[in-house]
UniProtKB/Swiss-Prot annotation:
Homodimer or homotetramer. Its main location: cytoplasm. Its EC number is 2.3.3.15. This is Sulfoacetaldehyde acetyltransferase. Keywords: Acyltransferase, Cytoplasm, Magnesium, Metal-binding, Thiamine pyrophosphate, Transferase. InterPro entries: DHS-like_NAD/FAD-binding_dom, Sulphoacetald_Actrfrase, THDP-binding, Thiamin_PyroP_enz_cen_dom, Thiamin_PyroP_enz_TPP-bd_dom, TPP_enz, TPP_enzyme_TPP-bd. Pathway: Organosulfur degradation; taurine degradation via aerobic pathway; acetyl phosphate and sulfite from taurine: step 2/2. GO terms for cellular component: acetolactate synthase complex. Belongs to the TPP enzyme family.
Length: 603
């Protein structure tokens, strides 16, 4: 087949091998990249990836492959695909698929399995792979007969899109071989529409009388390409728009109605504004419990407000918060329909649009001023750590920097159209105060699963999907150690990215719990003194150490120039003090109580 025809899928019924049926169905669904590590279990199919126009990007560890598929899917809006060797290669993917599940990311994991004649005998690399993923997939397809290869392959791609989450295709390794006769199925995509008439009209009636409506824009706005429709609805209502926790790209920060993110270390402006709401439109948001916890000393969620929840997944309607109206529909279509119905209606909030606009601007300005002056943490432990750092010098002779000051400087230096992924951890989560975006599909985090090692592989996958956009990963030194080897993937396969490593020599998020609940009794929290810049250089990347605050912005700009102009990956190692932001979960811990005498001092 000529190179120009390799993406043309055969039509009608043909004789082919199951491997060919699998590959052709992948091509029919637009697959051009897969992530994984080569293996004998799928080698027959892998052999024809290249002539089909599919690039297999080899990784260092399969968890990284799953995260890369997640990042790829979240940027492109298409499937991200991960594949690996049966048994350990597949079990290594579980954490990455779990993170994709909580991000509602259309990742397809292809899991070749032990051959049918060896199942149940405890053979080499044998594992029961379907139970591994049953909690973290929307659909699991098991190829029970090679003649059904195309059918099941097509279905997992369809269901990943229609159900907005990962799906699994499990294939006994001997089922790639043989001769079958089949037709390659065409992709099926669901048109969700704008919801039911009764729920739409109920929402309109609530909005007619609302005095202070607020929109909470969630992941459904991003995944549904609904930002423009969200803007139109917000402008019609004069409503401030808060974004959901770790959904900072769901509304453009340059828009005057943008208020910032809710959740841990989110925007005080957004919290103060939503606290005034009498009607909240949760647009594509499940209003997750962690993302609406009290923050900055404010229990801000408006408990008396009427909530209109718009969700493509009906099982999320009213799941977390009591709602007045639930609309099961596409965020884009629902927002557009509400705007249409409200266009010529006099609303109770129309008369106060100008006053509310002033309130929004005032709250945002106050928050920005506070961030400018909030150069360091102010709790007693952090103040002790700041004092301690005054007598220390970094290995390169500089100073340890305040994380908040660093994050502000990074924010100022962000290039246009940037994509950012953040790992879990104390400094990375404080970054929620500072990260803002002007286009969707720009921000990626491990969401409710909260696993370490997420940021670097995810941004590599994102960069594969959008090579023309700057790509930056944020990680603390603890989380960085879990996936920094994927720098080799970026270097080997010419996928240039920039990583910022906050080197504060500790597992900060958990250590903060030991500060607040365990009287500073530190166990297993210290991480001493690797040179991540030197490690990056050993892996073939560039490395920069920053230990002067005035160098933060220029270092990022230099690394981005290397990425975009020279195709180079760079690790920026920023030396930070040991000060710590608030704990994630004050609600989840208690002061210790001891009953036995030998532990009586451990309170």
């Amino acid at each position: 087949m000529a190179a120009t025809d390799n993406r043309k899928v055969v039509e009608g019924v043909h004789k082919m091998t199951p491997s060919e049926a699998f590959v052709e169905t992948c091509v029919a669904n637009g697959v051009s990249e897969m992530f994984g590590i080569m293996g004998s279990a799928f080698m027959d199919a892998m052999d024809i990836f290249a002539p089909a126009g599919i690039r297999l990007i080899p990784v260092v560890h399969e968890q990284g492959a799953a995260h890369m598929a997640d990042g790829y899917a979240r940027v492109s809006g298409r499937h991200g695909v991960v594949i690996g060797q049966n048994g350990p290669g597949i079990s290594n993917c579980v954490t990455g698929i779990a993170a994709a599940y909580w991000a509602h990311s259309p990742v397809v994991i292809v899991t070749p399995e032990t051959g049918t004649m060896g199942m149940g005998l405890g053979g080499f690399q044998e594992a029961n792979q379907l139970p591994m993923f049953q909690e973290f997939t929307k659909y699991q397809g098991h190829v029970c007969n090679p003649k059904r290869m195309a059918e099941f392959t097509g279905r997992v791609f369809d269901r990943a899109m229609s159900e907005m989450g990962p799906t699994q295709l499990n294939i006994p390794r001997d089922y790639f071989y043989g001769e079958i006769e089949c037709e390659i199925p065409k992709p099926m995509r669901v048109d969700r529409g704008h919801g039911g008439e009764a729920s739409l009209q109920a929402a309109v009636e609530l909005l007619k009388t609302a005095k202070f409506p607020v929109i909470l824009a969630g992941g459904g706005v991003v995944m549904g390409d609904a930002v423009e429709e969200a803007k139109q609805l917000a402008e019609r209502l004069g409503a401030p728009v808060a974004t959901g926790y770790l959904r900072n790209d769901a509304f453009p920060a340059k828009h005057p109605l943008w208020a910032g993110p809710l959740g841990y270390q989110g925007s005080k402006a957004a919290m103060k504004l939503i606290a005034q709401a009498d009607v909240v439109i949760a647009l594509g948001s499940r209003m997750g419990p962690f993302g609406t916890l009290p923050q900055h000393g404010m229990d801000y969620w408006p408990k008396a407000a009427k909530i209109i929840q718009i969700e493509a997944d009906h099982t999320n309607l009213g799941l977390v918060k009591k709602i007045a109206v639930g609309i099961n529909g596409d965020a884009k279509a629902v927002a557009a329909e509400l705007s249409r119905r409200l266009a010529d209606v006099t609303l109770g909030c129309d008369a106060t649009k100008a006053a509310r606009a002033d309130t929004i601007a005032t709250e945002k300005a106050a928050w920005e001023k506070e961030l400018d002056g909030w150069t360091h943490e102010r709790d007693p432990y952090s103040l002790d750590m700041i004092e301690e750092a005054k007598g220390e010098r970094t290995p390169t002779g500089g100073s340890y920097l305040h994380p908040r000051q660093v994050l502000r400087e990074l924010e100022k230096a962000m290039p246009a159209r940037v994509m950012v992924s953040t790992d879990i951890g104390n400094i990375n989560s404080v970054a929620n105060s500072y990260l803002r975006f002007d286009e969707p599909r720009s921000f990626f985090a491990p969401m409710s699963f909260g696993n370490c090692g997420y940021a670097l592989p995810t941004i590599i996958g994102a960069k594969c999907a959008a090579p023309d956009r700057p790509a930056i990963a944020y990680a603390g030194d603890g989380a960085w150690g879990m996936s920094m080897m994927e720098i080799m993937t970026a270097v080997r396969h010419d996928i240039p990215v920039t990583a910022v490593v906050f080197h504060n020599r500790q597992w900060g998020a958990e250590k903060k719990n030991q500060v607040d609940f365990y009287n500073r009794r530190f166990v297993a929290g210290e991480l001493e003194s690797e040179s991540f810049s030197d490690i990056a250089k050993a892996m073939g990347a560039e490395g920069i150490v920053v230990d002067h605050i005035e160098d933060v912005g220029p270092a990022l700009q230099k690394a981005i120039d290397m990425q975009m102009k020279e195709g180079k990956t760079c690790v920026i190692e920023i030396m930070c003090t040991r000060e710590l932001g608030d704990p994630f979960r004050r609600d989840a811990l208690s002061k210790p109580v001891r009953m036995l005498d030998k532990y009586k001092d451990y309170v």
